[in-house]
From Swiss-Prot:
Record-listed carbamoyl phosphate binding positions: 57-60, 84, 108, 135-138, 270-271, 298
Record's protein name: Ornithine carbamoyltransferase
Keywords, alphabetical: Amino-acid biosynthesis, Arginine biosynthesis, Cytoplasm, Transferase
InterPro entries per UniProt: Asp/Orn_carbamoyltranf_P-bd, Asp/Orn_carbamoylTrfase, Asp/Orn_carbamoylTrfase_sf, Asp_carbamoyltransf_Asp/Orn-bd, Orn/put_carbamltrans, OTCase_ArgI
Protein task: Reversibly catalyzes the transfer of the carbamoyl group from carbamoyl phosphate (CP) to the N(epsilon) atom of ornithine (ORN) to produce L-citrulline.
NCBIfam families named among the record's database cross-references: orni_carb_tr, PRK00779.1
UniProt KW Phosphoprotein keyword: no
Originating gene: argF
Subcellular location as annotated: Cytoplasm
Pathway: Amino-acid biosynthesis; L-arginine biosynthesis; L-arginine from L-ornithine and carbamoyl phosphate: step 1/3
Amino acid sequence: MVVSLAGRDVLCLQDFTREELETILKTAEMMKIWNKIGKPHRVLEGKTLAMIFQKPSTRTRISFEVGIYQLGGYGLYLNAQDLQLRRGETIADTARVLSRYVDGIMARVFDHKDVEDLAKYASVPVINGLSDFSHPCQALADYQTILEKKGRIQGLKIVYVGDGNNVAHSLMIAGTKLGANVVVATPEGYEPDPKVIKWAEQNAAESGGSFELLHDPVQAVKDADVIYTDVWASMGQEAEAEERRKIFMPFQVNKELVKHAKPDYIFMHCLPAHRGEEVTDDVIDSPNSVVFDQAENRLHAQKAVMALVMGGIKV
């Protein structure tokens, strides 16, 4: 069956079917191959992506800017000072105006409602580059990486250790839709959003996967195929950083913890990493680590998303 995602917003991966997610991953793989062999793929020739950044980023800005260029389009960088939002213009009006100039909008925001409002009022596709609730592009790059390294997603044990944040949400959603056995281990009080837990359980029931929430990292990583972690204090949580370090230290991914995983496990992190906090050097720099493959795959996964929703290519 041919799948078209033309005109779709990409706000949260729960909005997509398994077949649609597999289409994005297949397209990402194709983009990576074309890039490697030097095959032109300017499917967005003459199109413009507005890139709104409420918060700074290394990987998101570079990967989207390079990606839209490789697809033949142009990326227009807009920070908070470039827009009239601070002077009282609403997100609704901003979305309507931008839609008259550009062919797609990518937004990296603090509050997930902002990207939802952009999508509500824009007449062009809106892509969530990161919000406090969801990080869909990261999860797509993550599962592209897992497919490359393991050859499958169905039935793999994918363990997230740490804070039940936006990265955990998207990893849970996509993994359970794609048939993985997803385990999340957090300190008590730092679990993922209950709504996302419910989605993960429902997705797993439909896909043949499973979902489990634990508070013991050793139990969680037993026989893991994938171990994933993220920073303990996200941007905007700096005031809590010291308290979080104390609470999360038992959840550090170190050489003792990973001994409980399968010998050929892969270690994942969305970066930037706080070495010596959520992960030790001997893990992130080990042969099991694929963190820089993940970072590269942000480029290919996001190119797939842009090509599918802005260019209307069908796979």
